[in-house]
Amino acid sequence: MALWRGGGALGLLLLSAACLIPPSAQVRRLARCPATCSCTKESIICVGSSWVPRIVPGDISSLSLVNGTFLEIKDRMFSHLPSLQLLLLNSNSFTVIRDDAFAGLFHLEYLFIEGNKIETISRNAFRGLRDLTHLDLRGNKFECDCKAKWLYLWLKMTNSTVSDVLCIGPPEYQEKKLNEVTSFDYECTTTGPQTDEAKQRGWQLELSLGFCELIFVFQHPLSDFVVHQTLPYQSVSVDTFNSKNDVYVAIAQPSMENCMVLEWDHIEMNFRSYDNITGQSIVGCKAILIDDQVFVVVAQLFGGSHIYKYDESWTKFVKFQDIEVSRISKPNDIELFEIDDETFFIIADSSKAGLSTVYKWNSKGFYSYQSLHEWFRDTDAEFVDIDGKSHLILSSRSQVPIILQWNKSSKKFVPHGDIPNMEDVLAVKSFRMQNTLYLSLTRFIGDSRVMRWNSKQFVEVQALPSRGAMTLQPFSFKDNHYLALGSDYTFSQIYQWDKEKQQFKKFKEIYVQAPRSFTAVSTDRRDFFFASSFKGKTKIFEHIIVDLSL
């Protein structure tokens, strides 16, 4: 910041003018985003910070502090940010949470305190959180003795949704959930006088973290993801396709109103620009290969959606067909599939009166083939082969995911069932491991899910904490199976499948601002992983194998 060092009448004039500015305006002008943070008008994300940013609150609704070095959460530590609705405190160094630590946060709904080095949580640490709906304490293991009684009672009384609190001891409670403990009445009563020291101990909760296995995984990886290339623009979706032995990538860029097509450069060993399809608020670019023809469905929020075809004489994509605006108002996803050697695609419509529609190729063009349910604001569509039968799974903001089955007689999709107890699912993706069908279901806040088909229904395999997730994408490179879980509030997580435990384990954290899609691309015996970013730069990671013998 430059300081005024001049004197005279001009200096006095500037000083007088400054005094006329309201104090709040002066503070707002001086406010800066700390070097360790990333700030927008509504959110702050800090990595490795030693303090809570003292930024003028404005409309700040979410604050994320990750890998911080501060040692305690003091009383009223966040009271200068009264508009907070989400507070994420993950993988920090603090050991103590004091009484009234979150005082002043009357609108806080989501509080995540996972994977820290907590030793003590004061009895009144959560006092004043009247609007709290979600609390997550995972990554901490509790000694479920008398010192945990206050938390046990609080869990019984709170209306908030609280993650499972697992007990590490004593032996009779080991691996049990704290809220499933019968009672502390017998263990925590005495006929003798209770000393002040005993009372103080009863107000504290001792935790111990068991990170040995996790540290081992990170110290001895067999593979890794490293940044290969950074693209200087925002994006919301990435699709890949092959044509004539070359690999291409289509990237939707709504802010630049482009569908950028990249090709792999075999000489420079990176992805370079090949063509650019312009439009209005493009949210999706989906490639369709039919015989020797290459089409790209370009979904737009305004001006209708269109289909482009690659013209070899012009060596570029040219408009081939319009998609009527009356059917698709707010496209949110495009899914390509084949049934009986015929090519279809579906556009999920997320508008209030949306009408998700299936389109079919008829050798001359694509025409609307079947309109699915309306008024459900569909956010995603996934084509799935279940026991040899074709199905569509539609996720929606207004109901649980529904399953439609292809009727061979009518050659239309008909309702077949749903996935119960899975409200607010944004996206559904299918994948297979060892011939077993799995689904990944994305939730923005709460828990995303991995589910498995057991020949009768989909059953839960694993819950993954979601912190502002818009995508949970499965992908594989050779025998390595991964899940990428995006986050708008902290690091995105890459999970790797553990064959022995039959679950996904945390493998690596990557930082991508507001990730919207993850896409695997392989070429020249190299494997890449595109991470689109709605608010920052699009990143391309390379999957590498680490030789531990070196």
Swiss-Prot record:
Which sections of the protein are EAR repeats? 224-266, 270-312, 316-363, 365-408, 412-455, 457-499, 503-545
| Record-linked SMART domains | LRR_TYP, LRRCT
Q: Which UniProt keywords apply?
A: Glycoprotein, Leucine-rich repeat, Repeat, Secreted, Signal
Domain LRRCT: from-to ranges: 140-190
LRRNT domain span: 26-62
For this protein, the record's InterPro entries field holds: Cys-rich_flank_reg_C (IPR000483), EAR (IPR009039), EPTP (IPR005492), Leu-rich_rpt (IPR001611), Leu-rich_rpt_typical-subtyp (IPR003591), LGI_related (IPR051295), LRR_dom_sf (IPR032675)
**Is Protein biosynthesis among this UniProt entry's keywords?**
no
Q: Which residues form the signal peptide?
A: 1-25
Where is this gene product found? Answer: Secreted
List the GO cellular component terms: extracellular space
Q: Where are the LRR repeats?
A: 83-104, 107-128
Q: Does the keyword Cell inner membrane apply?
A: no
What positions does the record give for glycosylation?
N67, N159, N276, N407
Please name the SUPFAM superfamilies in this protein's record: 3-carboxy-cis,cis-mucoante lactonizing enzyme, L domain-like
Give the top-rank taxon of the lineage listed in the UniProt record for this protein: Eukaryota
Purpose of the protein:
Required for the development of soma-targeting inhibitory GABAergic synapses made by parvalbumin-positive basket cells.
Q: In its UniProt entry, what is this protein called? A: Leucine-rich repeat LGI family member 2
